[in-house]
Amino acid sequence: MRWIGLAIILASPFSLQAEVYLTSQQFVDGAFGANTAKLETLWMTKEVAAQSDKILGHAPKQSRLRYWKSGLKTAWILDEIGKEEPITAGFIVENGKIMQASILAYRESRGWEVRHANFLKQYQNVGLLPDYFLNKNIDGI
């Protein structure tokens, strides 16, 4: 589950049929409430791409990543391959730590438990160590 560390850095788009639990707009609205978040862009420079490769174990596929920001809080929507199919996940990050993780869309035929609060709560307050590993162990399905 090292790909979660990339919530701060990288995502890659996929367009397969999915069971949608939250739309992107619902996730962003829930992250910031009445506060207006600004849509920003993280460009995949050589340095960012190298960091992403260390975290994910593969190179990024796009040249930029859009995210939302208000103050020190950011919201990221990322797509990453689960066992076989893409999973769309949302992460609210504040002060370098994941405050909330959500599954927005799930495309796998098994492992649906990942969308439940009992599984997702293990990501709360998770951050990156200097070596790009997570500072907490994450249990997989």
Model feature map: region roles:
Residues 139-141:
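Glycine-rich and small/hydrophobic secondary-structure elements
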